[in-house]
Amino acid sequence: MAAYQKIYDLFEELKKDYDTIFAVPLTNGLSTNASTMQSIARELEMNVHVIDMYATCALEKHVAIWIKKLVDEHKSSEEILKIIQPAIDESNSLILVKNLQHLKRGGRLTPMAAALAGLLKIYPVLHINKSTEGRIDVLNKVRTEKRADAYAIDKIMDDIDIQHTHIYIIHSNFLEGADHFKKCFTEKGVPEQNIHIDYISSVIAVHTGLGCIAIQYIREEN
């Protein structure tokens, strides 16, 4: 109820000055914030575009800044949605975790999947995107951490247009790992200005645990 009231109060305040709002909350697959925003928007009779990112963290920030840039360019709401939606639909996040128990406890991964991974000593490469409906799922399973890292890099390089894709390497207190991935991508030709390193937000890090690396990527043409 506290979250509902905070969103309600914010929307009431925004309604005084704006006729259209873009909201970029945590994906529907991990949170009810988006549906709460839609419900409040209907109640207050507001024109709110709630964007489902099918993701978290850096991609939310990227799209919010992108929308602001398009607004400053005097794009209409329809034009903005037409520009950003294909990029969102094709965006992806790969997740490499040290310990699956955090995801299991938080209900983000089934106990069976976590137990099987531990028993077989495998390293799952997780992903979250439109195809997973914004939920964390297993993309592949390999035998060593080094192979998991290599698989993630190869998968991303196969997916992207290196000149027009932004790669966000986010981590939970594992800067050394993030720097390693950045070096790998630059060596493969990704422009350094298209690679960004940041922390995983705390609301997500409590589920992933320390030492996690997530690599998020989205296409944006100038």
Positions of the model-derived regions?
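Glycine-rich phosphate-binding loop signature in dinucleotide/nucleotide-binding domains
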Residues: E13-I21
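Mixed-charge interfacial surface used for oligomerization/domain docking
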Residues: T20, G29-S39, E43-H49, A55-N222
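Glycine-rich oxoanion-binding loops at beta->alpha junctions
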Residues: M1-L14
